[in-house]
Regions:
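Short, low-complexity, Lys/Arg-enriched N-terminal segments of secretory-pathway carbohydrate enzymes
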Residues: 1-15
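Conserved helix-turn-beta segment immediately C-terminal to the redox Cys motif
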Residues: 70, 74-76, 85-114, 133-137
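Short, internal strand/loop/helix patches
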Residues: 127-172
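Thiol-/selenol-based redox modules, centered on thioredoxin-like
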Residues: 156-216
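N-terminal "domain-start" segment that seeds a small globular fold
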Residues: 32-67, 88-91
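Hydrophobic membrane-insertion alpha-helices, especially the h-region
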Residues: 19-34
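Thiol-based oxidoreductase modules, predominantly thioredoxin-like and allied folds used
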Residues: 104-126, 139-152
Length: 216
């Protein structure tokens, strides 16, 4: 009689091979999914509102949705690279706060992004910057996490803005008006009057309101 002890080896080896194949397939599928997600995200990021940003507390949210903790919806946005310790700070913050208060938060918002790449202008943490600006300048507009806007570590959302205008801000408080479609339509340097911005922003908001009335 032939010994049967060696026979179970083949099925066991075959089963182990099948498991390896299945694991390999699962890994490949997972890798493909991650790659597709990254590609989809990069393809989607064709406008400012396609990006994600962080607030001063480090919480992440997509710009295309409302910021629940700020109670805002991004439709028309004035994006500003701000700083707390410069000679233009108080003048610009007062003007931006006034504009933010005038237009409300239903269709228009001022979005402030602190940046410390222009000398020692923002040495504190994001939360310290937010607390200081609110207490000292009385701002209620949303202040986001401190970012870089120059170099390889530039914030992607801000890089979209600078790529759109083919210019890098030379100093703080450059202001960029973003349409409801997420495109940069105009920009202003820090010394330019806020009235020019007010006119452009009001025109965009008026178009939004008229369009919504027509859709009713």
């Amino acid at each position: 009689m032939e010994a049967l002890g060696g026979y179970p080896t083949k099925p066991s080896a075959s089963r182990a091979g099948l498991i390896k194949v299945l694991l390999s397939v699962a890994v490949c599928m997972g890798s493909l999914y991650l790659l597709q997600s990254k590609l989809s995200k990069s393809q989607k990021a064709k406008d400012f509102y396609s990006y994600e940003v962080k607030d001063a507390r480090g919480r992440t949210a997509s710009l295309e949705f409302s910021f629940k903790w700020f109670n805002i919806i991004c439709e028309v946005s004035l994006v500003v690279n701000v700083a707390s310790g410069r000679e233009l700070t108080e003048q610009n913050y007062r003007a931006l706060q006034e504009l933010h208060r005038e237009r409300g938060t239903s269709h228009f918002n001022v979005l402030a992004f602190p940046c410390s790449q222009y000398g020692d202008t923002e040495s504190g943490t994001s939360r310290e910057i937010e607390a200081f600006d609110k207490s000292y300048y009385g701002v209620t507009l949303p202040i986001f996490s401190k970012i870089k806007i120059m170099g390889s570590e530039a914030e992607p959302a801000f890089r979209f803005i600078t790529d759109s205008i083919q210019r890098i801000p030379k100093w703080t408080f450059w202001k960029f008006l973003v349409s409801p479609e997420g495109q940069v339509v105009r920009f202003w340097k820090p010394e330019e009057p806020i009235d020019d911005i007010r006119k452009e922003a009001t025109a965009l908001v008026r178009n939004i309101i008229l369009k919504k009335r027509q859709e009713l």
